[in-house]
A protein has these predicted regions:
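Short beta-strand elements in bilobed, periplasmic/extracellular small-molecule ligand-binding domains
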Residues: 5-28, 43, 125
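Hinge/cleft segment of the Venus flytrap/periplasmic-binding protein
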Residues: 98-147
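A local structural motif
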Residues: 13-19, 67-69, 89
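Short, solvent-exposed amphipathic alpha-helices that sit
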Residues: 1-15, 30, 54, 58, ...
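Hydrophobic alpha-helical segments within soluble ligand-binding/sensing domains
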Residues: 1-3, 27-28, 76-81, 96-114
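Short beta-strand elements at the ligand-binding edges of bilobed clamshell
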Residues: 87-99
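Hydrophobic alpha-helical
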Residues: 22-83
Length: 147
């Protein structure tokens, strides 16, 4: 995923910084450096659930950061992330149907128990959603399976 992101950014002429997780305050310190006067604005693209959650907590927890972070995009569909999307802290999320993922995991476990040797690759569809699609019928069962 990282390679695809960097290729798109380079093609479009954007500059970027890849920040691997180091310590507990790695992302916070990078975001703080972004908010200095004259630094312009930045977009944060978090490539996994943990990074998305942490970035959303940092950006959403400060009235100042939102002025300099023009967009936060990430991965995941936990209720806390959907809430941050609804509040506007997160601009877009890539989500995958977790019910389908669980179903396929059980299906493969049963096949392994029954000693079926056929191994096949499974593909799950991912969707990019923004705030206006949170309550869309198209994604309702996937995003809110218990409601």
């Amino acid at each position: 995923m990282k390679q695809g992101l960097t290729e798109v950014l380079e093609k479009q002429g954007f500059s970027y910084t890849i920040v691997p997780r180091g310590t507990d305050d790695t992302y916070r310190s990078v975001i703080e450096k972004t908010v200095y006067p004259g630094s312009g604005t930045a977009v944060v693209a978090a490539l996994d659930f943990a990074s998305t959650t942490e970035a959303a907590e940092i950006v959403g927890g400060s009235s100042v950061y939102g002025k300099y972070i023009s967009g936060l995009y990430g991965v995941g569909m936990m209720p806390s992330l959907l809430d941050q999307l609804d509040k506007g802290t997160i601009r877009g999320l890539v989500v995958t149907n977790q019910f389908d993922a669980g179903y396929f995991a059980v299906q493969k476990a049963v096949q392994a128990i029954e000693k079926e040797q056929e191994r096949s690759q499974l593909s799950l569809e991912s969707y990019y959603i923004e705030k206006d699609e949170l309550r869309s019928k198209k994604y309702e069962k996937m995003l809110y399976p218990i409601d």
